[in-house]
Amino acid sequence: MGQLTKKFGKIDVSLPIPHLLNLQVDSYVKFLQEGATERRHDEGLEGVFRSVFPIEDFNRTASLEFVSYEVGEPKYDQPECISKGLTYEAPIRIKVRLVVYDVDEDSGNRTIRDIKEQEIYFGTLPLMTEKGTFIINGTERVIVNQLQRSPGIIFEHDSGKTHSSRKVLYSCRIIPMRGSWLDFDFDHKDILYVRIDRRRKMPATILFKAMGMSKTDILDYFYKKEFYRLDPMGRLMWEVQKDMYRKDSAFVDIEDGKGGTIVKAGKPITKRAWRLISEAGLETIEVAPDTIEGMFLAEDIVNPATGEVLAEAADEITASLVENLREAGISRLPVLHTKGLETSSSLRDTLVLDKTPDMEAAQVEIYRRLRPSSPPTPEIAASFFDNLFRSADYYDLSPVGRYKLNQRLGIDQSVDLRTLTDDDILRAIRVLLHLKDSHGPADDIDHLGNRRVRPVGELVENQYRIGLVRMERAIKERMSLQEVSTLMPHDLINPKPVAAVLKEFFGTSQLSQFMDQTNALSEVTHKRRLSALGPGGLTRERAGFEVRDVHTSHYGRICPIETPEGPNIGLIVSLTTYAKVNDFGFIETPYRIIREGALTDEIKFLDASREQGEVVAQANAAVDADGKLADEYVTARVRGDVLMSHRDEVTLMDISPSQMVSISAALIPFLEHDDANRALMGSNMQRQAVPLLRSEKPIVGTGMEGDVARDSGACILAEGPGIVRYADATRIIVSYENGLYPDRGGVRAYDLQKYHKSNQNSCFGQRPTCHPGQIVKKGDVLADGPGIEDGELALGKNLVVAFMPWCGYNFEDSILISERVVKEDVFTSIHIEEFEVVARDTKLGPEEITRDIPNVGEDMLRNLDGSGIIRIGASVKPDDILVGKITPKGETQLTPEEKLLRAIFGDKARDVKNTSLKVPPGIEGTIIDVKVFNRRSGEKDERTRNIEDYETARIDKKEQDHVRALGDALRDRLADTLVGKQIAVTLPGKRKGEVLAEAGAPMTRELLDALPVKRLAGLFKSREVDEMVDTALEDYDRQVAFLKGIYDSKREKVTEGDDLPPGVIKMVKVHIAVKRKLNVGDKMAGRHGNKGVVSCILPEEDMPFFADGRPVDIVLNPLGVPSRMNIGQIMETHLGWGAKELGRQLAEMLDSGAAMATLRHEVKDVFRSATIAKLVDEMDDETFRKAVSKLRTGIVTKTPVFDGASEEDIWSWIERAGMDGDGKTVLYDGRTGDKFYNRVTTGVMYILKLHHLVDEKIHARSTGPYSLVTQQPLGGKAQFGGQRLGEMEVWALEAYGASYLLQEFLTVKSDDVTGRVKMYEKIVKGDNFLEAGLPESFNVLVKELMSLGLNVTLHQEEGKKRPKRVGFMSAL
């Protein structure tokens, strides 16, 4: 049935929101490549194995090669892993091949001697659930995606901060995924240095020489040459080259050869003149003799007669050198082109500084810098240098790094080339030199084109590689120690290093986090989170303001609002609603393509780098009927700046206004009217909302509620078109069409979660929303999850709110709330606490779980069964026994009396202590579940047998329901064929003499439904029909057998016992459901960052009320709005009020019996939507009545962020509902009945109850544990600690002169051990004297001084009297 919902959004979004968990799920699927049958892609797990294998021994006589891997089926399903505290994992088997070679000692050639192939068990790998989580040791965890600096190349400068001269120093860094970092940087003298792996720097030309380049090669690559001729007459001639223009003055008149003068002597040579010189065909121009001085030679100058090197390349040219060269008969000088253009001599200067003569010396020098301890040979140095950047074993740029390198340096290399080439390095230096000489802008390291996401698959892949590399070393050692020809592959491979690395990563890594499971939104948000922290990332202390700040490239990719408030602000962020992560790990956002000012239906996803040159219009830009941009100039984004651009220049357009925010922020209506700080709080606090007893979706929503609820995994969704065969509170069975689940006849059973404990102890339960016989299509909601109503997120309640002060009870954001809210359980939530007790085998004997506990009265045992375990349904309070347990005490020497007692009463009085599991303070609730885990070989107690019988009966019923649904589905498939066909035999009924159908009668649908499925065999006259029925029944039998196998294995698991840790005999887990009603001290919040604590729960009759007698539900402080600047809450209040009143009025019309035509017209008039009008016209009267009846609590409205209801829309609704246009109402005081002096802003606001509940925080102690060292009470509720009396409290008591009270606080109530004992004795005796001793903290201070070599002793002066005793009760 269509829901009557008012949508205020004006922009038609053409793209559905991508599945919110795609990033996690797709990444792990890509890592595992589980379904691939043929050769898998060289990535993920396959890529890791291929990168480490083949493993050869040191003599190359044997090689261990990887063939393939297979992922098996997990031993336990997900619910079992959670209940038993296990990891949800699957076994991995790898097929490897051991090849043994014969090596010819003379030639070194290898010939294969033997090949052994074997499949080996290679440990287990945690599997991801369909919700994107991992179950590790029984708890659901999330691997958070890491946002880190992308591999590739980056050019930076220091903004003049490094050197005192304030000179801007440029640098360049090539970052691989794995291998040595390469840094090039200039110093203040413009010398270019290189660092490898952040070691000592050296002149960069050493690296070029090590690559095999000579001095001349280096100069030729980086500089152009210009030539000068030395005239015998002493003139200096400059050879004209078209691209060598320099703005110098002419030394002599430059003539064109036809008698004309191009440039007169002393005049500057302009670009026009240079063009005329080139066109005139002049080969040389005479220049001043000193022009060449200070330039540098481009080549070695060799005496042609003797072969002597007169001057070397890069030498500076001086007047004397020119004279010597002229005398030696040198007529033409090649010179580096460095003057006048953006080409400095820095590289030539570096070359002069570099003293290494050739490649060998350069490689040895690099080896010496990186390995200073070991003296190298040229061969070792050459091999070491080759392995630095050119070997795939030691260096991996990764496809991302190669992509970024290609993009930045303008190279066209394949992304499969993952090592660094000489050309890459040389091009990088050329770009760096150009940047330095032209003072170009550096790359922005915070730009999302330079930051990439490492999803879960890649993180696990890296860990797997670390484990495999450790294993590789062990395999090589084994190969060299043993005779390989006698070994099998399994003798070499030990998967334990891999298992250890994975266990450490999933259990303790900073990125493997305990899932935030407070509600469905918090789950989804946690999986969409990006963290800049973690291994290989930033640290909180080092991260500066720039990396935390919002960047222009974040638009549509990272939410500018949702981030934590504390020290992690800006380091932990969220993906936006439409964002996707591409194969390279860069975040992409979708845009509609615009051509010549007209919108197209094409959509393309762009990462931040590829968006650079585009002109992007906003989603709300006006578009005419032809799909063209209506305005000639539109607001657009160009390279991060917002400009007014001509419509013909616009190339792209945003998909939706909500694409710039995350899902949490997109759930805040009127977000555009809230201050960003409060919006941040609002989006964070929605994640803390506790699922309530009854969920209620917001009257004022944004349209995102359905997407979040459906994608969260908390709901059960139909997987395709089908029919609901069975539905109750615990199970739904659906038969699907379209070939889904062929092995079970298209029938799928869904078990609903009931009273499931979440990670945050909130109660997760699912409720069916479908009924038997209902026809469903793909994506329909079959069952709602916690905090979800009708497939939409429903985290709070719609309350009638008034903004007014009330006797100071809403001072400082406090909240005044009506008792009705508590009485009707509006904000009541259920929380589930789990307690566990383990019976171990101790040195003194086994612990025992029993009802027979010494020194415990029958009253304490009243709720325990015969096995000593509490019964389900019992109400418990603090200190009640949940599971009785006794532990053997150490045998002591017995007195004759004890021996006599033991002889008389037998073993009853044996030495055992009571170690029963008791309810801790602050917990009061009902036992909802008890699980007993026994060893497989152990004896089962009565409670275990009862649980097994109950579970077996449940499984039997499930099997029967499933088989029945299978039969119903079969009847539906056969009905079209069988109905109307003649029956061959008479069918008897159940009662004697009853006949269902005579022979020859036609088959009817009623008869078909009444007959058992098996009875259809051989029933019809037509042979063809019988054969078709027989074929269908064969399939049916096969499917029933398949189901029987599934249920038999479940029955077997119930009775087979459990794998318990060593030394554990039995384990019992008890779940208590605690009902938490709304209480004074509970934290509540709206969606706009408006939070507060309940200060008073006021009787309903005392609350402010309307003129018709209805009281408000909640009173908020109006002063909480202006300074916080979250005006969205006021707009939500007004729109909610209009929606509630209009819905109530329509429902009243229905109740008063208004004509259907009138009611339909009224509904259309209220909604004013063509879609709703069409829906209303299509509904029959009964469906329409139900739809209008649902509006009784208010019309559900959707106002998307940045595209929501305008002020005019809200006022028109308020006026349509017959209320005052300013949204204010006259209220009356509930205590006196008087009218309040001012009219009050009232309306409906969506309020959440947050998980900061007072019942979980309030704590009191009279006696309890003490610290061993200081003898002071411990701190905190978890330790059952005391209340700290700090120095400020001491000052307060001193100010009041309460000396005896203070003495009591600081001694007997704190750490005076002897005084405590004496106090206890005095209370027992009724004596009221305070006798304070020495506080233990004084002894600690004395010992501290002793450790510093100071001895402190106490001396009493002669003749001094001791102080008089004073009664401590009288001191009060």
From Swiss-Prot:
Its EC number is 2.7.7.6. Keywords: DNA-directed RNA polymerase, Nucleotidyltransferase, Transcription, Transferase. The keyword Signal does not apply. InterPro entries: DNA-dir_RNA_pol_bsu_external_1, DNA-dir_RNA_pol_su2, DNA-dir_RNAP_su2_dom, DNA-dir_RNAP_su2_hyb_sf, RNA_pol_bsu_bac, RNA_pol_bsu_CS, RNA_pol_bsu_protrusion, RNA_pol_Rpb2_2. It catalyses: RNA(n) + a ribonucleoside 5'-triphosphate = RNA(n+1) + diphosphate. GO terms for molecular function: DNA binding; DNA-directed RNA polymerase activity; ribonucleoside binding. One of its GO terms (cellular component) is DNA-directed RNA polymerase complex. The keyword Plastid does not apply. One of its GO terms (biological process) is DNA-templated transcription. It is an enzyme of class 2 (transferase). It holds the Pfam family RNA_pol_Rpb2_7. NCBIfam families: PRK00405.1 (NF001616), rpoB (TIGR02013). PANTHER family: DNA-DIRECTED RNA POLYMERASE I SUBUNIT 2 (PTHR20856). Belongs to the RNA polymerase beta chain family. The RNAP catalytic core consists of 2 alpha, 1 beta, 1 beta' and 1 omega subunit. When a sigma factor is associated with the core the holoenzyme is formed, which can initiate transcription. DNA-dependent RNA polymerase catalyzes the transcription of DNA into RNA using the four ribonucleoside triphosphates as substrates. This is DNA-directed RNA polymerase subunit beta. It comes from Nitratidesulfovibrio vulgaris (strain ATCC 29579 / DSM 644 / CCUG 34227 / NCIMB 8303 / VKM B-1760 / Hildenborough) (Desulfovibrio vulgaris). The gene is rpoB.
